[in-house]
Amino acid sequence: MERAKMAEESLETAAEHERILREIESTDTACIGPTLRSVYDGEEHGRFMEKLETRIRNHDREIEKMCNFHYQGFVDSITELLKVRGEAQKLKNQVTDTNRKLQHEGKELVIAMEELKQCRLQQRNISATVDKLMLCLPVLEMYSKLRDQMKTKRHYPALKTLEHLEHTYLPQVSHYRFCKVMVDNIPKLREEIKDVSMSDLKDFLESIRKHSDKIGETAMKQAQQQRNLDNIVLQQPRIGSKRKSKKDVYTIFDAEVESTSPKSEQDSGILDVEDEEDDEEVPGAQDLVDFSPVYRCLHIYSVLGARETFENYYRKQRRKQARLVLQPPSNMHETLDGYRKYFNQIVGFFVVEDHILHTTQGLVNRAYIDELWEMALSKTIAALRTHSSYCSDPNLVLDLKNLIVLFADTLQVYGFPVNQLFDMLLEIRDQYSETLLKKWAGVFRNILDSDNYSPIPVTSEETYKKVVGQFPFQDIELEKQPFPKKFPFSEFVPKVYNQIKEFIYACLKFSEDLHLSSTEVDDMIRKSTNLLLTRTLSNSLQNVIKRKNIGLTELVQIIINTTHLEKSCKYLEEFITNITNVLPETVHTTKLYGTTTFKDARHAAEEEIYTNLNQKIDQFLQLADYDWMTGDLDNKASDYLVDLIAFLRSTFAVFTHLPGKVAQTACMSACKHLATSLMQLLLEAEVRQLTLGALQQFNLDVRECEQFARSGPVPGFQEDTLQLAFIDLRQLLDLFIQWDWSTYLADYGQPNCKYLRVNPVTALTLLEKMKDTSRKNNMFAQFRKNERDKQKLIDTVAKQLRGLISSHHS
């Protein structure tokens, strides 16, 4: 068994060695290592070496056999090789020589080929470079275009170019470093465009703020031209024509919008517009403004996704500007130009906002505009109320009213509600009336102060017609009189009448363009005219009448003048009716109070005449110098009284043109005052004693007064009517001079008694003065029987008079 086993193992080993040998024979030498490693790893490498030696010997025997077999052929080959050797050397030399010649001859070709190689390489590089540049060139061109657009402030096209550059061109060459720089710079460029466009917008806003005055002035000129065209040419209602005007305005606005699109290259600000076809045509407000900065900035912010930020900024800045515009200068009320500039700025502001509203989508909306307008309206009205209250010149107030109307009409063209402005004008109308009244107070004062208070003399028909043309006066008798002749009134009558008409015209001027009905205009004029008559003119007349240095002649003329002015009131009524076309019979029509005014003035003048006459009488009476203790009689009236009567006669002679009752009342009043003053003179306390002679002299003066009364200084009195003014004096003097006490005491209290007008108190007072005189007249009088009897009689009469007085009081 063991032998069999060993034999089997020996066979396996031999087979393995055989395989290794075959592998060594067939394998490349470089790869024999692993094979040999397997032999050394085994345990039979000795036997393998034996096998290997055996195999080598076998191969050596085969090689030897082969060499022996081919030896003769080898010898022959060597012999032939030796023969060829010489030829080979010769050929070698020829080849070497040929090679040398070829190298020499091909050197230039090699150089040319090297140059060609370099050229080919350069050409390939250039071609590649051109291809790359052609790919990069649009990017560079777009970037250059972007820079040019930003340099020329074409920001919106620059933003569009930046978008194309970012999304279309840069992705194609994104692997280049300069492209990466561009990509990194794009946000900065966007911010730069954003900042520059915002800077342009700020410049635009600042320019608009500075030039709002010019814009508003132009818009108001357009409105004025349109209104003139409506009134003169078209004869159409103003509202309708204004709507047409607004349509025309927006036609021009639309054209201007096209020229100021976001791609417009115009700068911001105010444009200098010149009309080559018609130099006189007023340029439209929109023609003065380049709105492209707003449009560009709006589009830029919209593209950048910041439209809301832009809208908020724009509205905030415009609100600030609105507050500045609406703040009036402190001295605005001093001149009309101050108001005009204020209105121009407001109109300019809202013209711009209205244009922005209609040419942009949502930058401003109607609610925003309405909010601004409400604020502007309230502030404007408050400012006008404050500053107009300082105006004392009616011409300035009227010009202000016309300016406010134009201001309102201009803004109404752009769709702004202006009813509150017209309501405020009604308030200013009252102030205008007050300033007119103050002005006319001065006018009336100058007229009344400069008047000579003498009838107007006329020497020719032309002069006569001129006066009649100024004042409605008709007098057939005066017309028949030859020249020269006089009007009954003085110059202030036609002057005052014409000034009243001028006042009415001034009131009418203010009512124009206020959209008032004829009835409202008529009512306004009549109320203002009534104030003029009842307050201003009345006060002026009263001041003249109450003047200290006014004379009776002036007062008489004032009465005559006011009488004629009173008659002219109906013509003033007709005058107002003609200019307002409102009949006086219309319901609620206010009547003129001129008649009352002139009546009151006339009555005041009459009272002043009475007072003046009385004062003159008092002045004459102050000259009275009676010797109450005299016993002599001059048999003539006192000098002062003669002068007084002469004065009264001359005065009443002037009263011929006065109404009869006025002259009669004045004459009666003067006589009564004279009688009363004489009575007071007789009874005054300072006269403690008087004699019968003094009483008789006093009686002569009273007779002079009675003679004056009987002479009829003023026509129209019935017989003895004027003498009744002196009846108290006459009966008192008759009682004492005739010493008719028995009759007086017997008839006292009876209605037909002779001394009915003698008061017992008065009689007692005068009797006491005579009683004291009788007692002290002569120290020996008491020894005379008749004197004693007279004294007893006086005492008796005095006692009886006291009894009458006491019984009367009881």
From Swiss-Prot:
It comes from the Eukaryota. InterPro entries: EXOC6/Sec15 (IPR007225), EXOC6/Sec15_C (IPR046361), EXOC6/Sec15_C_dom1 (IPR042045), EXOC6_Sec15_N (IPR048359), EXOC6PINT-1/Sec15/Tip20_C_dom2 (IPR042044). Residues 272-282 have a biased composition (Acidic residues). One of its GO terms (cellular component) is exocyst. Keywords: Coiled coil, Exocytosis, Transport. The keyword Iron-sulfur does not apply. Residues 79-118 form a coiled coil. One of its GO terms (biological process) is intracellular protein transport. The keyword Transport applies. Residues 258-282 are annotated as: Disordered. The exocyst complex is composed of SEC3, SEC5, SEC6, SEC8, SEC10, SEC15, EXO70 and EXO84. Belongs to the SEC15 family. Component of the exocyst complex involved in the docking of exocytic vesicles with fusion sites on the plasma membrane. This is Exocyst complex component 6B. The gene is Exoc6b.
